[in-house]
Amino acid sequence: AHYQQVKLLEQDIIPDLSGDKKHETITANIASNADSLATWLIPAIGDVCHEYNLAVNFRLADENRTINYLKDGEVFGALSTHAQALPGCTLEKLGDMQYLLVASPGFISRYFPQGINVQALATAPAVAYDQKDDMHIKYIERIFGLKGGAYPCHTVRSSEAFVNFAKHGIAYCLIPKLQIQAELASGELINLLPEHTIVRALYWHHWVLLKGVFKAYSNAIILRAQHALSNQ
């Protein structure tokens, strides 16, 4: 991991020494959850990409597992739910991601005409990001006592697809409130269980020693995330 830090910091120093930061390509690797990438993360790097010739590589994983990329030295920063910093790293709390269980009016009429209950859930299709995504499973089990495998569940590795699955009446699912504010306001999507909102604290973990484009990138992520997550 230390070797990777040195190599990445070297490529940040070279453009400064040459005075040609606009033309030297700098590669920045970060680990992110799909929901952050689909909402606030891309705008966060816009100003940095305009200032530097930046090639960004995203390592996508569940927010519980992104920290492993930082631990292995594959990235200089990671968006994670872990509240404790790794050795040689520091962290900033960005805010809380709120997740709502939503469905379209048509889906509700078809599967939940008498409300959401165990009997209705047994036939209503849900959706998960991948086989390791257990947020929905834990949520339904905690509230209704229904275990994973006791109901149909689609799998799709795309946060944007979650929204489309819900809007087109294909599934009900947990989606970040930040991602569907317009759909909630218009009634295109309905919050099924307002009293059971999931709140997940999100942290930005990064190397302690950052300079140049990496420091600018880190600062942009912190500012954009804190602003977005405070306006849900």
Task: Describe every region a protein language model picked out.
Residues 40, 192-232:
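A late-sequence structural motif
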Residues 18-28, 119-123:
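Immediate post-signal peptide segment of exported/extracytoplasmic ligand-binding proteins
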Residues 1-22:
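Alpha-helical "hinge/linker" immediately C-terminal to small N-terminal DNA-binding modules
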Residues 76-80, 171-175, 192:
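Paired acidic/hydrophobic, glycine-rich loop segments that form the ligand-binding mouth/hinge
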Residues 62-63, 80-84, 104-105, 158, ...:
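Beta->alpha turn/N-cap motifs
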Residues 91-98, 102-170, 185-197, 226-232:
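C-terminal regulatory
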Residues 65-67, 161-163, 180:
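Short, hydrophobic alpha-helical packing/hinge segments within bilobed ligand-binding/sensory domains
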Residues 23-87:
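Central regulatory/effector-binding core of bacterial HTH transcription factors
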